[in-house]
A protein has these predicted regions:
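Short glycine-/small-residue-rich Rossmann-like dinucleotide-binding loops
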Residues: 15, 62, 86-87, 113-114, ...
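Hydrophobic/aromatic beta-strand patches that form the interior of the parallel beta-sheet core
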Residues: 11, 34, 58, 108-110
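Conserved small-residue-rich beta-alpha loop and adjacent elements
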Residues: 2-41
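A short, aliphatic-rich alpha-helical micro-motif
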Residues: 5, 72-76, 124
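Active-site-adjacent "lid/gating" segments in soluble enzymes
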Residues: 25, 29, 93-178
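Conserved N-terminal glycine-rich FAD pyrophosphate-binding loop of Rossmann-like flavoproteins
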Residues: 41-53
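Short secondary-structure boundary/capping segments
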Residues: 2, 48-50, 122-123
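A structured beta-alpha segment of the ubiquitous adenosine-cofactor-binding alpha/beta core
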Residues: 11, 51-102
Length: 178
């Protein structure tokens, strides 16, 4: 798809919520996004996921050395990478920022974690419902006297994390070009 980001290549390591949302927005504006997913992952989805539109996909089992080599080759020619694994996973796979930025110093390495890279919740899974509940925003939904009615991924995953990830990626990509 043609757009303002045409000519940029982004690697998206498949995840849920904010990472795919950010990659979708970049792809919708013309970036060439390559979604890397586990073999068989599409079969588990049971149909089309609208967050996966506008991009190609590649199945790689990153626990295999050959697949890690393929991803490193892709990253050498990419402008950006989006990953949403828990802290330390990419490093254990040999694909952390220290490795990929040595291979490609101009690579914008976008990390999306629920609770950051360190701190008391860093290793906990992060999901939209957790963020809006912990922040108090869930209290604002629903009717007085009833249980809260959670929004579907709109507040934390999309409006917060995914939007900020896409914006941060764009800012860093502009910075690299200057």
């Amino acid at each position: 798809m043609a757009g303002a980001l045409e000519g940029l290549r982004i690697i998206e390591l498949a995840g849920i919520g904010p990472g795919p949302f950010a990659a979708m927005m970049l792809a919708d504006h013309g970036a060439d996004v390559i979604r890397v997913e586990r073999p068989g992952a599409r079969d588990l989805m049971g149909g089309a996921d609208p967050l996966q539109r506008s991009r190609r996909s590649l199945a790689l089992d990153l626990k295999w050395a050959e697949a890690v080599d393929v991803l490193r080759d892709l990253a050498r020619t990419a402008d950006g990478l989006i990953e949403g694994f828990r802290p330390g996973v990419m490093e254990r796979l040999g694909l952390g920022p220290d490795v990929l930025l040595t291979d490609n110093p101009r690579l914008v390495y976008g990390r999306m974690t629920g609770w950051g890279q360190d701190g008391p919740l860093a290793q906990a899974a992060g999901h939209d419902i957790n963020y809006i509940a912990l922040s108090g925003a869930l209290h604002l939904s629903g009717r007085a006297g009833d249980k809260p009615t959670p929004a579907m991924n709109l507040v934390g995953d999309f409006g917060g994390g995914g939007m900020m990830l896409a914006f941060g990626m764009l800012a860093a990509l502009i910075g690299v070009q200057r």
